[in-house]
């Protein structure tokens, strides 16, 4: 390898490869069937482009902080399949797990999910990469195992790991 090729490799290829690895581009989804829940969460309901989820999450964070409610793990419930639902009609619940005794005021709502059997998909990747990897794996797993892909799914974000639950 010539010197210029080595410099190019070290200056461009290695950093780009490292960044892709850091973001989780090469991460695999892990899938299992488990019992999960129960959960209690405070959330807001939003409609539109899922790319706005970070902005909507900030609104929920502000509302919880204003009411001095301790936020737990961030959660999202996708209510509509983006493959079959027009962008303006896509609905999502965005929020945080909360304590059993937390009192939530409007505009937020309280959701409760009982303990149930789910297909659980875990992906350790950046928030930009993880959902695509998780849902692709979940849809493939469902098709391969004759399981109907159904919504809503429930997502939890813990320590850089996205966990997507689909009830069975």
Question: What are the functions of these language-model segments?
Answer:
Residues 2-168:
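A solvent-exposed interaction/effector surface
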